[in-house]
Each structure stands twice: as structure tokens, then as C-alpha cells.
């Protein structure tokens, strides 16, 4: 099993409701990192993809098919969107993996979106339970929160 922890610092513009992810720290139990640079790169790439799911990517389905399957209408993060990333490799050799290693291909996707949702909730005082947390979603949540 994989274990990880993720922390995110965000800034929310109260005029445009845009979320800027300032920093993301991801600590991952990797077993034994046979090639730490590649392991770190895998984790950072997956983390950036997961952050995109949190605030940018909105896959729309229509009649069972993806309706926005083009790069022009399904926004994904680029290098310019990358916040400061810190990756902590927690090395505890895994007795059942090759040379003590664990797979790290999927675990970077698990924590960042929840960490972003929690950070935005901490900043604004209203909870989010669906992704992406777009400016429109933030504006609607703020309106509901202000009315309550």
C-alpha cells in the first residue's frame, strides 16, 4: 500500500474568485527510491496533474461521451501553472517490492485535490465537495455562505 500526505497553500482573489495555488508539499512513502530523481519527477508530474483536476479540468459528458475532448475546451495545467512544489521522499524499504521499492505512479493523484479543497475552505469558510473548484463554483459557494 502507498502512503502520502499533502499540504497546499492557496490564495483566493475575492474579486475574481480565482484560486492561485502558491505551494504544494507532498510527502510520499516510496519504499526504497532506486532512482530518486525519477521518483521525484513522477511524483511532481502527478501532483501537478492532480492540482489541475482540483481547479482547472472539467471533463463534461454528454450522452455518455466526453463533450470537451479537445485541448481547447478542457484546460490542463502547464508549467506556467505550477506552484512551488516540494517533494519529500519517505524511504522505508518495502520487503515485497523489487529492491525494496514501491510503485509511485498513482499515489501523487490522491491527496492534492482534497488538500486544495481544504485550503480553500480554510481561506473562505465554506466547504467544497466537487471538482474542479472553479471561480464560478467559489462565487456560488460564497453567495450561499453570505446568505446563511
Q: What is the predicted function of each stretch?
A:
Residues 1-148:
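C-terminal catalytic domains of large/alpha subunits in multi-subunit enzymes
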Amino acid at each position: 500500500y502507498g502512503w502520502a500526505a499533502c499540504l497546499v497553500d492557496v490564495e483566493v482573489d475575492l474579486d475574481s474568485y480565482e484560486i492561485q495555488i502558491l505551494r504544494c508539499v507532498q510527502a510520499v512513502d516510496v519504499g526504497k527510491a532506486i532512482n530518486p530523481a525519477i521518483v521525484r519527477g513522477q511524483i511532481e508530474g502527478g501532483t501537478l496533474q492532480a492540482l489541475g483536476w482540483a481547479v482547472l479540468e472539467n471533463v463534461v459528458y454528454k450522452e455518455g461521451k466526453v463533450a470537451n475532448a479537445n485541448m481547447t475546451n478542457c484546460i490542463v495545467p502547464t508549467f506556467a501553472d505550477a506552484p512551488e512544489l516540494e517533494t519529500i521522499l519517505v524511504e522505508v524499504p518495502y520487503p515485497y517490492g523489487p529492491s525494496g521499492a514501491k510503485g509511485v505512479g498513482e499515489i501523487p493523484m490522491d491527496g492534492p485535490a482534497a488538500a486544495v479543497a481544504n485550503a480553500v475552505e480554510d481561506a473562505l469558510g465554506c466547504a467544497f465537495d466537487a471538482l474542479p473548484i472553479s471561480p464560478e463554483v467559489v462565487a456560488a459557494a460564497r453567495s450561499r455562505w453570505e446568505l446563511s
